[in-house]
Design a protein with these regions (language model features):
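Conserved beta-strand and immediately adjacent loop positions that scaffold enzyme active sites
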Residues: 3, 18, 116
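Acidic, metal-coordinating catalytic segment for phosphate/diphosphate chemistry
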Residues: 1-15
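Short acidic alpha-helical/loop segments enriched in Asp/Glu that coordinate divalent cations
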Residues: 66-74, 107-111
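Terminal peptide-recognition signature
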Residues: 4, 57, 97
Length: 170
């Protein structure tokens, strides 16, 4: 699937300091009410990640195409998840994009999959992930941790950094 980190830098030209966070609709059959990316969606057979990002940006958060085309491929995260329908484990490849959004941008849920959007400061995101309280959709947490490492919000001096990077890159 494709995941978009919707980032905001409140000082022009600076490192982003905030991340848009979605709360999934409580009516969703999978991970209802969990915290999620601004935009994320499954990748259909033969569908290109970049086109999927543009489609999902419009469908999930009403992001205009002229803004969505600024999403940049940033990383790939691979993980496994339990798959009850196939009696085992499913390998996931997550295409990670970063999208720097204007300070005055406000996402609007367009497809009923999102209950609300909130703009969180990066330290709040880190604290929430570190609390390990099951608030986040699991694969979303992995993609956000990847972004925090890539952008230097987490550093080798932080407790558990090496173990975290090692686990993420397995």
């Amino acid at each position: 699937g494709c995941h978009v980190n919707g980032l905001v830098a409140h000082e022009n030209g600076s490192q982003p300091d905030s991340l848009w966070v979605a709360r999934r609709a409580r009516t969703k059959p999978t991970y209802p009410g969990k915290l999620d990316h601004l935009v994320a969606g499954g990748l259909g057979h033969g569908e290109q990640p970049g086109e999927n990002v543009l489609k999902e940006c419009a469908e999930e958060a009403s992001i205009p195409r002229e803004v969505a085309i600024q999403a940049r491929p940033a990383s790939i995260v691979q993980c496994c998840k339990a798959d009850e329908t196939r009696w085992g484990v499913k390998q996931e490849t997550l295409f990670c994009y970063d999208l720097l959004l204007p300070c005055d941008f406000k996402p609007v849920a367009a497809d009923g999959e999102v209950e609300s959007f909130e703009l969180w400061e990066i330290p709040q995101v880190i604290d929430s992930l570190a609390a390990d309280n099951d608030d986040w959709k699991p694969n979303v947490a992995l993609v956000i941790i990847d972004m925090l490492i890539r952008r230097g919000f987490l550093a080798p001096e932080d407790d558990g950094y090496v173990e975290l990077v090692r686990a993420l890159r397995r």
